[in-house]
Amino acid sequence: MDPYKHRPSSSFNGPLWSTNSGAPVWNNNNSLTVGSRGPILLEDYHLVEKLANFDRERIPERVVHARGASAKGFFEVTHDITHLTCADFLRAPGVQTPVIVRFSTVIHERGSPETLRDPRGFAIKFYTREGNWDLVGNNFPVFFIRDGMKFPDMVHSLKPNPKSHVQENWRILDFFSHHPESLHMFTFLFDDIGIPADYRHMDGSGVNTYTLVNRAGKSHYVKFHWKPTCGVKSLLDDEAVTVGGTNHSHATQDLYDSIAAGNFPEWKLFIQTIDPDHEDRFDFDPLDVTKTWPEDIVPLQPVGRMVLNRNIDNFFSENEQLAFCPGIIVPGIYYSDDKLLQTRIFSYSDTQRHRLGPNYLLLPPNAPKCAHHNNHYDGFMNFMHRDEEVDYFPSRYDPAKHAPRYPIPSATLTGRREKVVIAKENNFKQPGERYRSWDPARQDRFIKRWIDALSDPRLTHEIRSIWLSYWSQADRSLGQKLASRLSAKPSM
């Protein structure tokens, strides 16, 4: 399959300067004026077009994941999992699928340093024979909240103060003091791995729970995990200050330079699976995005490898206009009832339509590389050439028909309409276990970062007390150490 077969044809590489409409431009240095010192004439079409295009070069930046870098490569199946899924691109070991990957920071603006303590986005678009599959995740396997209803509020709290445009800890800790399920995510974010050394040396995770479906219709919950073959490397706080002060685009440059030099980044893909019939056997809800699945009871299973061996050709076209959505799936991979995933299915495509327009899936990096057909017509910036006379379905004049049916999860759901928190919250067990797995020096660095955050002068005694209570419930000694060090600070 040629991943570039369906790129729009163009002739912009001509040897002579021209307008957007192709007319020759014999002088691209001087405006048209009345005499050598007279006023500029509005009839200078090339000048007006040049300025008008420049005025519109920038598009709205992503609300989150604005700062990012992309690269292209392939995914290769190494292990047979056809007993779990009928996905065509996973049909046999050795099968390769073209991919494009975008790494990103999450909260900060497009030009912000890549050394800030922030989750990292890890999104992959697979160009399969049955359409695109977007696996849109992060470098951490869990998330702050479990219900997408809180996503806008969460992002607002993490973003800069709307009055001062300064990110402030009191706002962050105030919001999350209402959400103890966030503790697990904070054991990743405030840990030593909270600032990846670069994009090549970090894990990836699908974060949400998805569903694999095999040809017989049997379903399994699944979590996706990427492990870099070159290992995980992170920056400690003082190292991040040094690196960021030297080059605020260090991770983007590292990715680009490594690929250009032939040092291709590679990740192994693993999955964890749970039979939905067995989901009640655990002390956590498998659909709770704030939980990990313990590897000792839900082991990792190898699937394949991903190699990034080609840099993008144009940053704007293949990074800024690159768009992902968890709703874009292929036969054999389906959603779950994970509440955060359910809201992401709508929100991601909606924000892309706002940012790029209703025809964003026609843009080259977003369009499928396989043949496709529907009656989704027109709209702003529709550049697909079509010559059909029939734009409805069904029709006896159009041979297009339904695709063959493929299996999807068939579980029967019953229940009342209600807005409730899941039954198995269990917010403190996994954060405590993760903290206790670290050596004393790593624990101490985690505590120091929390002391710095809890020392924000605008943080109230009530909010500090709530956080001390939360961390004490996760690990008694952790809560005691935080309380002791806070009480020793003069400002406390």
From Swiss-Prot:
Strongly inhibited by beta-mercaptoethanol, sodium azide and potassium cyanide. Slightly repressed by 3-amino-1,2,4-triazole (3-AT). Activity is repressed proportionally to increased concentration of NaCl, KCl, LiCl and MgCl(2). Heme binds at R62, R102, F151, R344, Y348, R355. Disruption phenotype: Impaired catalase activity in leaves. Accumulation of hydrogen peroxide (H(2)O(2)) in leaves, which consequently promotes nitric oxide (NO) production via the activation of nitrate reductase, thus leading to subsequent NO-mediated leaf cell death, as well as increased S-nitrosylation of specific proteins including glyceraldehyde 3-phosphate dehydrogenase and thioredoxin. Leaf bleaching and cell death; these phenotypes are reversed by melatonin treatment. Increased tolerance to zinc oxide nanoparticles (ZnO NPs). GO terms for biological process: cell redox homeostasis; circadian rhythm; hydrogen peroxide biosynthetic process; hydrogen peroxide catabolic process; intracellular nitric oxide homeostasis; protein nitrosylation; response to abscisic acid; response to bacterium. Gene3D superfamilies: Catalase core domain. A motif (Peroxisome targeting signal) lies at residues 484-492. Belongs to the catalase family. This is Catalase isozyme C.
